[in-house]
Regions:
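P-loop NTPase catalytic cores that bind/hydrolyze ATP
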Residues: 97
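Glycine-rich phosphate/ribose-binding loops and adjacent secondary-structure elements
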Residues: 281
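Structural motif marking the loop-to-transmembrane transition
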Residues: 2-3, 48, 241
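Bacterial Sec-dependent N-terminal signal peptides
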Residues: 1-25
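Aromatic-lined, polymer-binding surfaces characteristic
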Residues: 91-92, 100-105, 116-277, 286-303
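Helix-turn/linker elements and helix-coil junctions of extended alpha-helical scaffolds
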Residues: 106-110
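Low-complexity, Ser/Thr/Pro/Gly-enriched N-terminal "stalk/linker" regions
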Residues: 24-93, 121, 125-126
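Intrinsically disordered or highly flexible coil/loop and linker segments, enriched in small
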Residues: 65-69, 111, 192, 290-293
Length: 303
């Protein structure tokens, strides 16, 4: 469990896309590093928790009531969202990406508070309102093709499993059923034949895990297609390009799915994802130069 917690928290911190004010007093520092436990960075489990809290506090600076949404000021005119039609999913993205950090923190401390608000109460309230037509957080059922909403709901499925006792279990059956129906409308809907298939997989695996009837043939088909993208030595072809998403998406989401759901639901696929990750170990250092520099391929350097 400790290894799983550490994997998810590291993934969460690396995935959160928040801007940081680079004032000296606002930069996270590792205090009292322990180089016996962590020879390279000195960061222990507690340091990673502190780093997560540091990032999440930045987000909660914008949250003053349970109704406030994780929607942050834009820095540049060309940044997403580009029009008002994209704002609802941008708000959902803010919820989902910050929950990547909040979920393992809540697993460790369900009573966590930030900016005078109980973090668990905030996220549960926002999750419930995803399927509430009267709420500004409402996300309607899918009516078209694949969209960013699929990705964010898949991300929520990961977090709800990671901190199920805090985020999912306290909901009423009616609330669970309503949220599940919204998620299924996207999870069982069309996708793109790339790492996007993981988000269908996470939605369907989570709801299957909770006892809901899901399209299992579609779930298994997406798993097979994801594994078919493997090209050896740790590399996946991401329909059809090779880039750092091979390490970020496939080699992160694959093992997380295997640990959370796969070993129980589809052990043969879980085993293959883990073997593919092991293949990556010897090749990963070649993504960097001798002085630690890396190629800037799109935005993937952020990850």
């Amino acid at each position: 469990m400790k290894a799983r917690f550490a994997l998810f928290l590291l993934f969460a911190i690396l995935s959160l896309k928040l801007s940081v004010v680079f004032a000296q007093e606002n930069i996270f520092t590792v205090r009292q590093p322990d180089y016996q436990k962590s020879p390279y960075t000195g960061m222990t489990r507690q340091h990673w928790i502190q780093a997560g809290e540091y990032l999440l506090k930045g987000a909660f600076n914008y949250i003053h009531t349970l109704d406030d949404q994780m929607y942050f000021p834009k820095q540049l005119d060309k940044t997403y969202p580009r029009n008002t039609g994209e704002i609802p999913v941008a708000k959902l993205e803010g919820l989902a990406r910050t929950l990547f950090v909040a979920a393992p923190l809540l697993k460790d401390n369900p009573e966590l508070e930030m900016n005078g608000i109980k973090v668990a109460d905030y996220y549960r309230y926002q999750l419930i309102n995803i399927s509430n037509p009267e709420s500004k957080s409402y996300i309607p059922h899918r009516t078209g093709g694949p969209s960013q909403t699929l990705l964010e709901l898949g991300s929520l499925a990961i977090s709800m499993k990671a901190a199920q006792e805090v985020l999912w279990n306290p909901l009423t059956k009616k609330q669970k059923d309503s949220l599940a129906a919204t998620m299924l409308s996207y999870g069982e809907g069309p996708t793109i034949g790339s790492n996007w298939m993981f988000f269908n997989v996470f939605i369907l695996s989570f709801l299957k895990d909770q006892g809901y009837a899901v399209n299992e043939s579609y779930l298994e088909s997406n798993l097979q297609k994801l594994l078919a993208r493997y090209r050896g030595e740790g590399w996946y072809n991401d329909a059809p390009a090779y880039d750092y998403y091979s390490a970020w998406a496939y080699q992160t989401y694959g093992p997380i799915w295997a640990e959370m759901f796969g070993k129980k639901q589809y052990p043969q696929y879980a085993r293959q994802f883990m073997e593919n990750q092991h293949d990556m170990v010897d090749n990963y250092p070649f993504l960097f130069s001798r002085d630690g520099r890396m190629n800037m391929w799109g935005r993937s350097i952020c990850f």
